[in-house]
Amino acid sequence: MHDIDFIKNNPELFDEAMQNRNFGKIAHKIIELSANKKHTLTQLYSLQKERNNITQEIEKLKKDNIQCDTQIELSKEITKKINHINNMIKTDSELIDLLNILPNIPDKKVPIGKDENDNIEIRRYGKKVDFKFPPKTHYELGENLNLMDFKQAAKLSGSRFVILKSQLAQLDRALANFMLDVHTQEFGYSEISHPVLVHESAMYGVGQLPKFADDSFKTTDNFRLIPTSEVALTNLVSNTNTNANELPIRLTACSQCFRSEAGSAGKDVRGMMRQHQFNKVELVSIVTEEQSELELERMTQVAEEILKKLELPYRVMMLCTGDLGFSASITYDIEVWIPSQNQYREISSCSNCKAFQARRMNAKYHTISNGNKVNKFVHTLNGSALAIGRTIIAILENYQNQDGSITIPHVLRKYMNNQDIIKNNNY
């Protein structure tokens, strides 16, 4: 949600920001709708004050046994006008509807561009494996080892699902435990276990609704399955006012995530790259305005640390204005090397949403200045660290051997009964 006062004071700057995010000029419309709403509310407050005065007059006249029919009729007329204006306010949602679909303002650092082709590479890490044989895809490796089953998953649930067996199921669990251990023990995040079904208000709070309603699954009783733990973790501070001394708050969780993948027809049809259901470890930070810039750098480095420990080659990209997520002001994507595709693919996205989500959630913090309490909206950040399915893909492809077996990364072996090789499963 945007600050209307900022739009009023900076209409040209706001229009430029929206144009860079592929929206037209809209500031004038917002200012006009806001002025109309303010005028309507002024009328309402004036009528309410007038009715209160008449009510007091009626009570006084009755007490003195003086006739007050005229005042009673006038009170009724004013009440009708108040009810009419209240109904207008309830039904006139044009301003809110407009603000709800406008994305966040890009940070000044964000490069201007149309799509992913205009993203900027920030840094690279790791050396790509020089295979002495043609590398197989993750799904060829998984199916050949009898550890990855898409056919049985399709019988159960349809396309874009997978069944992992034996050592790959262990790898999935090992990765979650490994990532959470790093985040909590080395970087001070607090682990949270949370519901995967949430109210639509929680989805609205982080910007998933109303614009992206088709991208998530909805139950018959109006719950939503979360597309990411960001929804649950960020909403833990909705409608709160935190003491600034308690910030930053750093949270992490591993959860199942659910996405309809609307608009993804034909993309990554084979394999685990794009699934309706997957596991992901998420990071969320709740910080002050002054802390948020450095917090994004820290969060990105935390996500990178997982890939460094797994010894997987990757690069960090800064997204351009045309590729930014709806709620993000600035985003770093971390892309891991996928040998079979001969390209880097996204495995993490770390974003600073500044106060955009906080306004939707009414999440504030307070400081004391000159003896007075000062309230501000918190800044929220989120990052994948990491998407577990895509990490499995990267491990299978980068650690594959010529015989089709997979070497288990050293840091994961203690989570997998000290095994060092993933090999054919007899089940």
Swiss-Prot record:
Q: Which GO terms describe its molecular function?
A: ATP binding; serine-tRNA ligase activity
Residue positions annotated to bind L-serine are 228-230, 282, 384
Residues annotated as binding ATP? 259-261, 346-349
Keyword list (alphabetical) reads: Aminoacyl-tRNA synthetase, ATP-binding, Cytoplasm, Ligase, Nucleotide-binding, Protein biosynthesis
Question: What top-level branch of life does the organism fall under?
Answer: Bacteria
Where does the record say this protein resides?
Cytoplasm
Any one GO CC term of the record: cytoplasm
Broad class of enzyme this protein falls into: ligase
User: Might you name a Gene Ontology BP term for this protein?
Assistant: selenocysteine biosynthetic process
Per the record, the pathway is: Aminoacyl-tRNA biosynthesis; selenocysteinyl-tRNA(Sec) biosynthesis; L-seryl-tRNA(Sec) from L-serine and tRNA(Sec): step 1/1
Quaternary structure note: Homodimer. The tRNA molecule binds across the dimer.
HAMAP family of this UniProt entry? Ser_tRNA_synth_type1
| Cross-referenced NCBIfam families | serS
Full protein name: Serine--tRNA ligase
Q: Which gene encodes it?
A: serS
